[in-house]
A protein has these predicted regions:
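N-terminal first-folded block
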Residues: 8-53, 71
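Glycine-rich hexapeptide-repeat left-handed beta-helix
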Residues: 1-14, 48, 54-56, 62-64, ...
Length: 176
């Protein structure tokens, strides 16, 4: 574990021992990071109004923002990939999802298990998608069902980021 872990009020981030937070990333307040999860350079997870929960082996990539509003916690399941510069705001992302680079998911939205939100898609407030949805566009809509090949690609991405986090942790520990 490294990076910037900061309290807010009485809440301090809870980071699993095997999770990794990159230098330059900020994890603030009521945030829980699961085992082997990772938060990459320049990402911000700010749990100052409601909790943020990130499951096991989920990666929050460079430049992402995860935040919540009153009555809208941010929940991200296990084995998710949240691509560079995505915004996850007061919503629920079930396990096994891929959130594409630059996608935005707003308050009260729910992304079903094993779904893909395409790069730059905008999921409006309160919009819900069933499991295995391929979600595209502005505003987002379901285009089709996620294929087995796409599901395997998500799992491969999860494994890759678990390995990369371990590599970065080792390199930084060696060169600190």
């Amino acid at each position: 574990m490294s990076g910037n872990l900061l309290p807010h009020g009485d809440a301090f981030p809870e980071v699993a021992p095997s999770a990794w937070v990159a230098p330059g990333a900020y994890v603030v307040g009521d945030v829980h990071l699961g085992e082997e999860s990772s938060v990459w350079y320049g990402a911000v997870l700010r749990g100052d109004t409601e909790p943020i929960r990130v499951g096991a082996r989920t990666n929050i990539q460079d430049g992402c923002v995860v935040h919540a509003d009153p009555d809208f916690p941010a929940i991200i399941g296990d084995d998710c990939v949240v691509g560079h510069k995505a915004i996850v705001h007061g919503c629920e992302i079930e396990s096994g999802c891929l959130i594409g680079m630059g996608a935005t998911i707003l308050n009260g939205a729910k992304i079903g298990e094993g779904s893909i939100v395409a790069a730059s898609a905008l999921v409006p407030e309160g919009k819900e998608f069933p499991p295995r949805s391929l979600i595209v566009g502005i505003p987002a809509k379901s285009a089709k069902e996620v294929s087995e090949e796409q599901t395997e690609d998500i799992a491969r991405g999860v494994r890759t980021y678990v390995e990369r986090a371990a590599s970065h942790r080792e390199s930084l520990g060696r060169n600190a």
